[in-house]
Amino acid sequence: MFRAMMKLLNRTAAQVPTRKGSGGWRKPVDSPHMTLVGAYGSPYSIKMRAVLRYRRIPHRWVVRNSSEDQGFPEAPVPIIPVLVFHDGENGYSESMVDSSPQIMRLETDYSERSLLPTDPVVRFLDHLVEDYGDEWLTKVMYHYRWHHLYGEAIAKAGNMLPLMSDNQMDAEQHRAINEFITDRQMGRTALVGSTDLNRDVIEGSFVRLLTLLEDHLSQHQFLLGGRPARGDFGLFGQFSQLFFWEPDSSLIAAKCSPRSMIWAYQIDDLSSFEVDETKDWFTRDGLPSTLSALLCEIGRTYAPFLIANERALTAQESELICSIEGNEYRQTPFPYQLKCLNWIREAFGQLHEGDRKAVEQLLDGTGCELLLADPHG
């Protein structure tokens, strides 16, 4: 029973999947190029599945801990999704984790239907939007799934998550795992910032985002113009849970931004979308005010969080504290978010001088300009 409970921990936003052995299924010669191992309740898994669909990369979708989840090479760290690359024969060459590096690896291996805007300035903004989706919106997703005030959402997640890998699970086992995973995930809410103190910040950011997206999507098909980019999939991953799974947040979304909900359904499978070169990404000189509004939202929420997280980790403090929209925000600092901040700075530093100046001008006054400052300068 305990082993079964432990296997179910990976099917949430903060999953820690168990590792499978080396035996079992072997790839047929004529199978797809790669296998994506993930879970329906994992926003990053659904994000990567949508990326593979849009890019029309032949792949196999396998649910973690299902009967098909056998024989894959050990991932670098025990998280999902895992992207397993086939070796062209009857086995595998490697596996990798973390959705953003996975996307960039695919950009190296496949040139068609790229997600990288051609304008390096817009490409940097896309990086920023994807990171916001991955690292800030995940707090919103976790909040609407596990915060103690959302009883229906908790009950739904507790009932459905255990069945993802085995829909024929017996009732006694299902009940025990339901209780185990619910208790564990509710106990982790404070670690990701979902507390009573932070509730107004998290929920306010969700409503503001929906409102500005309703305006943007009334004029533009994607976040950065006429074709999708990384940022579209970064937001979609979290929206796949907030819109399609969580009862409370889905009602809020339907009320505040029906266009966002339809957009998310579209992003889930863009395999039929034909790229029109005449409807490309925005350029630095043609960014609409609706995109500036999104950057301002990132600047008022995610940017102060990242800076406070960096300061807390540098000072070896057990709690980060910052002000977001006039409200005090507190949570445990996380080293991974410091890596995210450093990656943003590295991407900015790799731009040519003229492009850096263009980024600085575009971000001036949004709040995001704080992320570009050299902490040692």
Q: Model-derived features: where do they sit?
A:
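Short N-terminal edge-element motif at the start of the domain
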Residues: T189-G225
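Active-site/pore-lining binding-face segments in mid-to-C-terminal subdomains
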Residues: F236-E328
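GST superfamily/GST-like fold recognition
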Residues: L223-F243
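Intrinsically disordered, low-structural-confidence terminal and linker regions
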Residues: F2-R19
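Divalent-metal (Mg2+/Mn2+/Ca2+)-assisted nucleotide/phosphate chemistry catalytic cores
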Residues: Y150-E203
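GST-like domain detector, emphasizing the conserved glutathione-binding G-site
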Residues: P17-E172, L223, F243, S292, ...
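Alpha-helical packing segments of well-folded alpha/beta enzyme cores
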Residues: Y44, M48, I202-L209, L213-H216, ...
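Inter-helical turn/loop segments and adjacent helix faces that build the functional surface
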Residues: E107-S114, V192-L197, Q219-L224, E246-I252
